[in-house]
Amino acid sequence: MLTMGTALSQQVDANWQTYIMIAVYFLILIVIGFYGYKQATGNLSEYMLGGRSIGPYITALSAGASDMSGWMIMGLPGSVYSTGLSAMWITIGLTLGAYINYFVVAPRLRVYTELAGDAITLPDFFKNRLNDKNNVLKIISGLIIVVFFTLYTHSGFVSGGKLFESAFGLDYHFGLILVAFIVIFYTFFGGYLAVSITDFFQGVIMLIAMVMVPIVAMMNLNGWGTFHDVAAMKPTNLNLFKGLSFIGIISLFSWGLGYFGQPHIIVRFMSIKSHKMLPKARRLGISWMAVGLLGAVAVGLTGIAFVPAYHIKLEDPETLFIVMSQVLFHPLVGGFLLAAILAAIMSTISSQLLVTSSSLTEDFYKLIRGEEKAKTHQKEFVMIGRLSVLVVAIVAIAIAWNPNDTILNLVGNAWAGFGASFSPLVLFALYWKGLTRAGAVSGMVSGALVVIVWIAWIKPLAHINEIFGLYEIIPGFIVSVIVTYVVSKLTKKPGAFVETDLNKVRDIVREK
């Protein structure tokens, strides 16, 4: 999910106890990174994918934490505070999309990526699945990942820097460097194992925060009567359909389509120890997501009553959680809640860094060095993976150095870009024997292009007809599906091995 992109302008008071809690949080992340480093054996698959040995509970919470980012704690409560319950449509779409993802994509992807040459990245899976000897598909999909995730990562660094600036009154660049250093440390040294464990730890912090803040806020207001007060202030605050047209509802609901093609999320399914563990992961993951999102909605709704009751001037709705955590709680607890925001931001940054590093190493460096070198020089490739983490982070920091850079405006569309270009391709690759390399390349590129064209030239026409304001993932997804299918039908069919592999994957997934 998208990280915060807007400025956090509401400064709150912080004392030494708050700083101590943040320091303890950072120390725990460093220890986990060191633990991941000590567990490493110099194997590339282990560094990038945890050796496919991750349990269901870490899988579930790491997928959730890397997905939600600062949006769940900052963006969603701010949106509900500003518009009321109608903002909840996006949470319904996301929860449904994530739930379907666990059923439709997760089991087959876990089995198929191992069967198809033990692929450790999505582009590598596409290459092996479609016998792409020229590596065209691998290079194009790898480039999409590297470019978009570098921008994604930059957005996370901006959010971290602005959090320290707004919550502590510290210099933006100091906060940026501090967040970057901690994330780079545990990702660089600990690899996938450290990232997954820290995501689990951060997921727990995020969940506690999203349950604690609205409950304490209600206790300090009017209990369950707080929602009655919110409705009395403005009846439409609790109206799920307020201010939304059919197009608006569909646009919010369609965010769920993006899940099937988000590399930093579906890589979690590839790393789980066995596909048979996915039901456990699904139950915990979806429960975590539902409770967390409902908590975020509750923060926004209680905030509508909280702000006037405490005579607070809220300059930026996205700072609502920060303000409530500092006003309602002891500084030590307030520090814990600020750590929850950092957890949300940093869990996404680390996941995106590692996916980008994996792509640079597996999808590009391996092409230069060759398959045989990759098998016999594993430590070299692990070192290249670590250096890739550092390089991508430095580029993202450089872009984030100017937080007002216009590139930030593009990051909000990356979810749609991945969803339109990768989601249909992943589904076709897992279920349809007729998919061809030409169809895959055409569908992926057309989906991405439609998203770009829709954002640049179609959406500005929304004032003429609201259909033009449709969320860009919908036209992008539809065009990608059509182009992939039509081009695959018109081009040379894949070999018989594809049907054999698909049947084998289906049979393994059905095993109890």
UniProtKB/Swiss-Prot annotation:
CDD domains: SLC5sbd_PutP
Subcellular location: Cell membrane
GO cellular component: plasma membrane
Induction of expression: Up-regulated by high osmotic environment, such as increasing concentrations of NaCl, and low L-proline concentrations.
Record-annotated membrane-spanning stretches: 16-36, 54-74, 85-105, 139-159, 174-194, 200-220, 240-260, 286-306, 327-347, 381-401, 410-430, 438-458, 467-487
KO phenotype (gene knockout): Cells lacking this gene display an approximate 33% overall decline in L-proline uptake and exhibit significantly reduced virulence in several animal models, thus showing a negative impact on the ability of this pathogen to survive in vivo.
Alphabetically ordered keywords of this record: Amino-acid transport, Cell membrane, Ion transport, Membrane, Sodium, Sodium transport, Symport, Transmembrane, Transmembrane helix, Transport
Sample GO molecular function, one term: proline:sodium symporter activity
Membrane topology, from the record: Multi-pass membrane protein
PROSITE patterns referenced in this protein's UniProt entry, alphabetically: NA_SOLUT_SYMP_3
Biological process terms in GO annotation: proline transport; transmembrane transport
Stored InterPro entries: Na/Glc_symporter_sf, Na/Pro_symporter, Na/solute_symporter, Sodium:Solute_Symporter
Any matching Pfam family: SSF
Catalytic reactions on record: L-proline(in) + Na(+)(in) = L-proline(out) + Na(+)(out)
Domain of life: Bacteria
Primary residence: membrane
Entry's family note: Belongs to the sodium:solute symporter (SSF) (TC 2.A.21) family.
Function as written in the Swiss-Prot or TrEMBL entry: Catalyzes the sodium-dependent uptake of extracellular L-proline. Since most S.aureus strains are L-proline auxotrophs, this transporter may aid the bacterial persistence during an infection of tissues with low proline concentrations.
Name of the protein this chain belongs to: Sodium/proline symporter
Species assigned in the record: Staphylococcus aureus (strain NCTC 8325 / PS 47)
Gene label: putP
